[in-house]
Every structure is written in structure tokens, then in C-alpha cells.
Amino acid sequence: MVAVRGAHLKENTTFELVSWVESLRQDAKVSSRIEGTYQRCIELAAEQENGPLLLWRGRELVEILVTLSMDADTLIAALLYPLVEGGCYSTDALKEEYSGTILHLVQGVEQMCAISQLKSTAEETAQAAQVDNIRRMLLSMVDDFRCVVIKLAERICNLREVKDQPDEVRRAAAQECANIYAPLANRLGIGQLKWEIEDYAFRYQHPDTYKQIAKQLSERRIDREDYITHFVDDLSDAMKASNIRAEVQGRPKHIYSIWRKMQKKSLEFDELFDVRAVRIVAEELQDCYAALGVVHTKYRHLPKEFDDYVANPKPNGYQSIHTVVLGPEGKTIEIQIRTKQMHEESELGVAAHWKYKEGTASGGAQSAYDEKINWLRKLLAWQEEMSDSGEMLDELRSQVFDDRVYAFTPKGDVVDLPSNATPLDFAYHIHSEVGHRCIGAKVEGRIVPFTYHLQMGDQVEIITQKEPNPSRDWLNPNLGFVTSSRARAKVHAWFRKQDRDKNIIAGKEILEAELVKIHATLKDAQYYAAKRFNVKSPEELYAGIGSGDLRINQVINHINALVNKPTAEEEDQQLLEKLSEASNKQATSHKKPQRDAVVVEGVDNLMTHLARCCQPIPGDDIQGFVTQGRGISVHRMDCEQLEELRHHAPERIIDTVWGGGFVGNYTITVRVTASERNGLLKELTNTLMNEKVKVAGMKSRVDYKKQMSIMDFELELTDLEVLGRVLKRIEQVKDVAEAKRLYG
């Protein structure tokens, strides 16, 4: 017996909606919802050239999901999804007409498209966009598995649909499903979808082998089915004679599983045990072992082929007793023995758990948490399997899974955090007030310190007090209380709102303690930091440090660089030696000097580097500053730091111009200010990709007061002309208010 489910896409056939809805065998309320939704789908698809195809896809999805006993919301979402994907129906309109659950499911299926985009790319911005998409997809998957089941059904529809397409189209669809979706269906234990995905993929990837096995099965089908019928009758009589409540039935075999066993065990078709297969479905667990006793008493079994997956379930939860016996005429027969619940779970997987849970409130929050932990483990196992297939880039896999932590609230809600996140990061992710009032945390019921690094799947409970009381120590990166920029920004915001006098006192104490370490004074701090950090008074400097607006390490590093700089004599001596060496080489060499990016006072071949503070690029007016041990530091003419250096050490200033023979990239920072909206980052990165500009890094923050998003991109450009063009292109993107270059 071989399982076959054909494609149902037919042209020029009359579709009867009422008859179709009745064939789904749902209750009156669900049937009414399905019929009403389909009428709406007809309206939406009426103006579309491919409208009939979209309607067919929706019907196919529903028919597959009904066999999995999925709930009404899942069926409605499945009907609507092809129309949303096809552009007939916007998510905004969907939100207005249907419940939030329907919208959530449709968007979850959409986000799973991120899997199909996991193609190798050298573009860092493209990789970043993929990582962001996959994170959102994982959150949807962990939060509600139903979107995954819809996606699996949708892939089966696609495999059916491409049946008559060119060979390369079928092979591409088959490879994606074999590498990604079949392992996912397996991890979720949905055998009913797994076998169809595998058989279609095998049929398209290895058509000759598929036809050969199908032909061999067909040639002996009648004899084999007669044999199985007699065997089932004999075994059923034996079960009744022993008062065992069990149903004996022939078991369908799948061509892919037959081929895989032939490959794995190096067997010919005639040597396979499970071409002849029987299943015994018992009422209770004790009946399973009683049935096994009857089987082994009546027929001789092969000990090496016995497996007890009831006592030792497979990783995906599969349970069954497997045995192989010698039946009449000495022919081998594979027998599976399981309970009704085990059988349903092996066919429906996680969908079976939904079926049992629906309509009950048992288990509560802990049950929801346990379910999601188990579900998360399955997803992590699946991504390992998927990466083994070579389909997922190792770097992307690391960014998605190794650089993120998925933790849970006591109610089972999933929280996506960066790796090394702490309980305080978790608290501030939930809500600002939860973070401000946090005085402790429990992980898995145990008290943990604020420096504890959350692990994948941790259940976190935050302990709070009535009044908010954050500590300034939370802002110290060396202490490790807070690691996420989101949490740090919320702590900063709290301290900014507090009494200014307290911030001044605290900031002064912090600054004095750090100045001692670099042998500097408050007077040095006031002199060197005022202009650099745009503070007009010592009190403003202290208040900025105390509130967290000014990073103490940035202030100290800036002061240290100016207070403890090398003497002029030391730098002059090194420069003289360098110039002398360069002159000697030029005098003794008959080769033409190699031109560099920057020419110093007409002398080539000197060591220069571009200052990070102002990031000059070709086209900028520039000037050099003699440093200790690092040659000439090249600045923009209007650089604020260069202005300070002119004032304090004018003898080290040297004229420089751009050389003519250098071709390469220069790193500059571009700040983009824009209104917050979904898809903005993707449009910006696409714009930069179209301009063939490499993104070396990106940081972003939100100005909540102005409701604007501020993004700083580190770009690698060749010259000022390219920069001007890039800024113009960015400002043409919708909702971008300003794009400008930062000078330090």
C-alpha cells in the first residue's frame, strides 16, 4: 500500500462553494465563517489576473489543515494568506476586517519567507537585513506554532502547483523543501505533512529512481494487498481471542522512505521488510505490550529489527513499538504498535497538542511556558539540522542564534534579547517602570545576581518594589549590570529626570575619581572638555556625567589624550629622522617615487593616517599634525580637534594635499534622521547597495521627544563626489528628514 495525494489544480471546472464547505465537515459556526471569508476572497480576487489561482491556493491550504484538525482561526488565516501574499489585500485592511489573531497568523507566515532568503551574500547590509527578518520569524514561530503549520501546508501547495513547470523550477522548489521544510515538519512530528513534502521533493529531484520504485510497487500491488488483507484478518482474530482492544490495519508506505531505507541498508527492493507493513492501534498502553506478546507468539520475529520508541521516544516525540516478523510463506512484515493518542500525535505532531488543549484552561501559565520551552527546543534542533544541509550561512546562523537569547516571562511570553543579557535588561525590555523598580530576579525559581547572563529558554521573574530606585552603577559597563543599549537608554532617561543638583554632585565625584587615575585635575577637565562636549560650565559637565548623558570613559579618554601627550622635542626628533630617511631613499633610488594618498609638503612616501575625529576624504581641504610614532595625522581644515591642536602646538601643524595615485575607500560617518516606520532600514540599506557603497557599521537610537529615529552609518567611500551623491539618494527615501556627514 503506497500513499498518494495528488494535486487538485484544475482549469475550466465549476466550483460549488456550499458543497466544498460541507466537505470540510466543520460545525455550523466554523462553516459559516469559512463561507463568509471565501465570499470576501472572491471579491478581492475578482480584479486579479491570477485570481482563480490565488483562490485555489487558499482552498488547498484549508483542505490540508482540516486533516490536521486545526482551529477556525487557522483555517480563516490560510484562506486569506494567498491574497495578502499576492498583493490583493493589505495587512491594514486585514486588521480592520478581521481579528488580531488572524492578522498575527498571516504576518507570521509572511515572516517565515525569511527562510527562503537565506542565500549566500557578501553584502553586510543584506546579511543584517536577513538576520533581522529571521529574528522576527523565530519570535512568531515560538509565540504561535500555527503559522508554521500554515507555511508547511503552503509549501505542499507550491510543490503540487509546480508539477507541470520546467525541470529547473521543480528542482529548485524540491531542494528548498528537502533541506528546510521536511526537517521542520519532522521536528514538529507532523508525519502527515512530512511524507508528502519528502515524496514530492524526491520525485522532482530523482524522477527516474522515483518512477522505478513506483513501477516495482505497482507490478506486485494486487498480490501484496491480498497478502496484507489475509495477514490483517488473521492477526485481528488473534487479538480478539486474547481480549485485546486493538485495530489492525494495513499501513501505507511512502516512496521516499522506501528509497532511503534501500540506501541506508544497501538493500535491493525485494529485500525490504517494510514494503509489507501493518499497524496495530490499541486503546491503552498496556494493550500495546499485550499485542506485542501475541505477535511474537504467533510469528517468529527478527530481534535485530526490534525498536521500542514508547520507552525511548525519538527527539521529535514520536512513540511506537517497531518489530519485524516472518509471516506466511516466510515473507517479512514490519509491524508498528501504538495507542490511538500516539498515532494521532505521530500524524499531527504539535497540531495534536493544540487539538487536546483547545477548549480547556488546564495547565495555566506554567503549562504555556513548558509548551513554549519544548517548542523552542524543537526549533533550535531544526536550525542545527538545516545548517547541516549547507543551506544556511554559518555567519548568519551565528548572528541569529548565538548572538540572541530567547527568554520567557512567567506567563510564557517570549522575550528576544541580545546575548549576555542580564535580568535588568529583561526587566527594562518588559517596561521602563519594571526596570526602575527592580530589586531582584529569579531564574527557574532561583534568586540570581543582576550580573547573571540569561540562557536560551530561561524563565525569568522580576522582583520589584513600590518606588523606582535605579542605581548609577547600572550605567558602569565594567560592572556588567546592564548590557543592552535599550536598557541603558532607559536608565539614562530616568536619571535625567532627577534633581539636577544630585546629578552635579554625583557627576563631580565620578569625574574626580577618574581624573586621579590619569594624574589630571578638575581644571584640566573644564579646559579640555568644555568645547569638545559642548558644555558651557563646569556644572553642566558634572550634570551630564551624573545623568549619564556624557559617557565618563569618553570624557576621560579625551582629557588623557591632551593632558598626557608627548613633548614637542620627542615628536620633532622622530619626524626629523623620518624625513631624513625618506630623503636618503629618494637620493639613492633611481625609481620613480610611489605616490600615496596624501602628500606632505611636496615629499612623498611619508607615513600618514586619516584622523578618526573628522574622517577626511578626497575633495576635503586638509592639514597634517605630527604625532608621536604614528607619522602625520591628516585632519579636515575645519576639524574642531585640529583647531585645538593649532592653538596648543602650532609648530606641529604641516601642510598636506591629496595625492593623485591612490585608489581606495575611506570610512566616514553619515547620520540619517527620519520618522519611525516599518521597512525604513531596509529601504536605506537597499539604497546604499544600489550605490555600491559598503556599510562598515551602523548604530541607531530613537529621539522619543521628537519621535524621530537617528541612524549613524559608517560608510566606505572613494571621494567627496560619491558622498554628495549618496546623501542626495538617501534624502530621496520616504520619511527621511535629513542625511548629513558627521565630523566627529
Curated annotation (Swiss-Prot):
Swiss-Prot/TrEMBL keywords: ATP-binding, GTP-binding, Kinase, Nucleotide-binding, Transferase
Instruction: Please name the InterPro entries in this protein's record.
Output: ACT-like_dom_sf, ACT_dom, Beta-grasp_dom_sf, HD_domain, NT_sf, RelA/Spo_fam, RelA/SpoT_AH_RIS, RelA_SpoT
Q: Name one GO biological process term.
A: guanosine tetraphosphate biosynthetic process
Any one GO CC term of the record: plasma membrane
Domain (ACT): give its ranges.
669-744
Pfam families per UniProt: ACT_4, HD_4, RelA_AH_RIS, RelA_SpoT, TGS
Q: Which reaction does it catalyse?
A: GTP + ATP = guanosine 3'-diphosphate 5'-triphosphate + AMP
Q: In which pathway does it act?
A: Purine metabolism; ppGpp biosynthesis; ppGpp from GTP: step 1/2
EC annotation? 2.7.6.5
Explain the consequences of disrupting this gene: Mutants remain rod shaped, and do not acquire the typical coccoid morphology usually seen during starvation.
Q: Does the keyword Endoplasmic reticulum apply?
A: no
Top-tier EC class: transferase
Q: Residues in domain HD?
A: 54-159
The UniProt GO MF terms for this protein read: ATP binding; GTP binding; GTP diphosphokinase activity; guanosine-3',5'-bis(diphosphate) 3'-diphosphatase activity; kinase activity
- Which residues does the UniProt record annotate as the domain TGS? 403-464
Matching entries from CDD domains are given as: ACT_RelA-SpoT (cd04876), NT_Rel-Spo_like (cd05399), TGS_RSH (cd01668)
Stored SMART domains:
RelA_SpoT (SM00954)
Function comment: In eubacteria ppGpp (guanosine 3'-diphosphate 5'-diphosphate) is a mediator of the stringent response that coordinates a variety of cellular activities in response to changes in nutritional abundance. This enzyme catalyzes the formation of pppGpp which is then hydrolyzed to form ppGpp. Also plays a role in the reductive division that occurs during the initial phase of nutrient starvation.
Q: What NCBIfam families does the record tag this protein with? A: PRK10872.1 (NF008124), spoT_relA (TIGR00691)
Q: Which family does it belong to?
A: Belongs to the RelA/SpoT family.
Q: What is this protein called?
A: GTP pyrophosphokinase
Q: Which organism is it from?
A: Photobacterium angustum (strain S14 / CCUG 15956)
Classification of source organism: Bacteria, Pseudomonadati, Pseudomonadota, Gammaproteobacteria, Vibrionales
Q: Which gene encodes it?
A: relA
